[in-house]
C-alpha cells in the first residue's frame, strides 16, 4: 500500500473516557496509519485496547501499528513503530515478516534514517518539527532536513511533533508523506471535530 496521508497516534491519557469513539471518528475522516501508543505497564489493558483498535482498523481499511512492542504486534499480526531506545529493527523484521509495516524514529538525523532503511524499515519518521506536548525535549527538525531526506532516503517520510492544521501544509510541500498527529487531532472537543480535522489533514495531500 502507498503510505501517504494522515498518521494518527493515540494517547491514552488524552483519550481517557472516549478512546474508541474518537479513534473511530478519526478513521471516518480518513487515516492512512494508526499507531497505538501507550507507555504504561498494564499488559492486559494494552492488549484489550489494541484488539479493539484492530477491529476498527479492519472495518475502515486502515493499517494498525503498535508503538514500541514488536511482540504485541506479532500477536495481533500488525506492524510496529520503534524508537531509538526500543531495540534494533532487524529482529522486529524477522519476527513480523517481510510484509509488516515497520517504522523507525530518526529524530533529526539522516544517518539514523539511512541505517533504518538498510535494516528494512518501511518508513522513517523525523521530528519534532514544532513544540510538542508528547516529546518536548526531542531534537528539533526543519524543512531543510525534509528536502535532504527526500533526496537521500528512498522511503516514505513521516513527520511528527506539534503538528496542527495551521502548520502542516509546508511540511507536505517540502516532502512529507505522512503527518503524524496526536494532540492536533485527538485534542478536539468532540468526535465530529476529530472527523473534520482528519479530513482537513488529508486534504493537504490532494493539492
UniProtKB/Swiss-Prot annotation:
Residues that hold 2-[(2R,5Z)-2-carboxy-4-methylthiazol-5(2H)-ylidene]ethyl phosphate according to the record: 132-134, 162
CDD domains named in the record: TMP_TenI
Swiss-Prot/TrEMBL cofactor(s): Mg(2+)
Catalytic activity: 2-[(2R,5Z)-2-carboxy-4-methylthiazol-5(2H)-ylidene]ethyl phosphate + 4-amino-2-methyl-5-(diphosphooxymethyl)pyrimidine + 2 H(+) = thiamine phosphate + CO2 + diphosphate; 2-(2-carboxy-4-methylthiazol-5-yl)ethyl phosphate + 4-amino-2-methyl-5-(diphosphooxymethyl)pyrimidine + 2 H(+) = thiamine phosphate + CO2 + diphosphate; 4-methyl-5-(2-phosphooxyethyl)-thiazole + 4-amino-2-methyl-5-(diphosphooxymethyl)pyrimidine + H(+) = thiamine phosphate + diphosphate
Gene3D superfamilies: Aldolase class I (3.20.20.70)
GO molecular function, one term: magnesium ion binding
Listed InterPro entries: Aldolase_TIM (IPR013785), ThiamineP_synth_sf (IPR036206), ThiamineP_synth_TenI (IPR022998), TMP_synthase (IPR034291)
Pfam families found in the cross-reference section: TMP-TENI
Family per record: Belongs to the thiamine-phosphate synthase family.
Family matches, as PANTHER family: THIAMINE-PHOSPHATE PYROPHOSPHORYLASE (PTHR20857), THIAMINE-PHOSPHATE SYNTHASE (PTHR20857:SF15)
Protein name according to UniProt: Thiamine-phosphate synthase
Organism, as annotated: Pseudomonas putida (strain ATCC 47054 / DSM 6125 / CFBP 8728 / NCIMB 11950 / KT2440)
Amino acid at each position: 500500500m502507498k503510505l501517504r496521508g494522515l498518521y494518527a497516534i493515540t494517547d491514552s491519557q488524552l483519550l481517557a473516557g472516549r478512546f474508541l469513539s474518537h479513534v473511530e471518528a478519526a478513521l471516518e475522516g480518513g487515516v492512512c496509519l494508526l499507531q497505538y501508543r501507550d507507555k504504561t505497564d498494564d499488559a492486559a489493558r494494552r492488549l484489550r485496547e489494541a484488539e479493539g483498535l484492530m477491529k476498527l482498523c479492519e472495518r475502515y481499511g486502515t493499517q494498525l501499528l503498535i508503538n514500541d512492542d514488536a511482540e504485541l504486534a506479532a500477536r495481533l499480526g500488525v506492524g510496529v513503530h520503534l524508537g531509538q531506545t526500543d531495540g534494533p529493527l532487524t529482529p522486529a523484521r524477522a519476527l513480523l515478516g517481510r510484509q509488516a509495516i515497520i517504522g523507525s524514529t530518526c529524530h533529526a538525523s539522516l544517518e539514523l534514517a539511512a541505517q533504518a532503511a538498510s535494516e528494512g524499515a518501511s518508513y522513517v519518521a523525523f521530528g519534532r518539527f514544532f513544540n510538542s506536548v508528547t516529546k518536548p525535549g526531542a531534537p528539533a527538525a526543519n524543512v531543510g532536513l525534509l528536502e535532504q531526506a527526500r533526496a537521500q532516503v528512498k522511503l516514505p517520510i513521516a513527520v511528527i511533533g506539534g503538528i496542527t492544521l495551521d502548520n502542516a501544509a509546508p511540511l507536505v510541500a517540502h516532502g512529507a508523506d505522512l503527518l503524524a498527529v496526536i494532540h492536533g487531532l485527538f485534542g478536539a472537543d468532540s468526535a465530529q471535530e476529530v472527523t473534520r480535522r482528519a479530513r482537513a489533514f488529508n486534504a493537504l495531500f490532494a493539492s
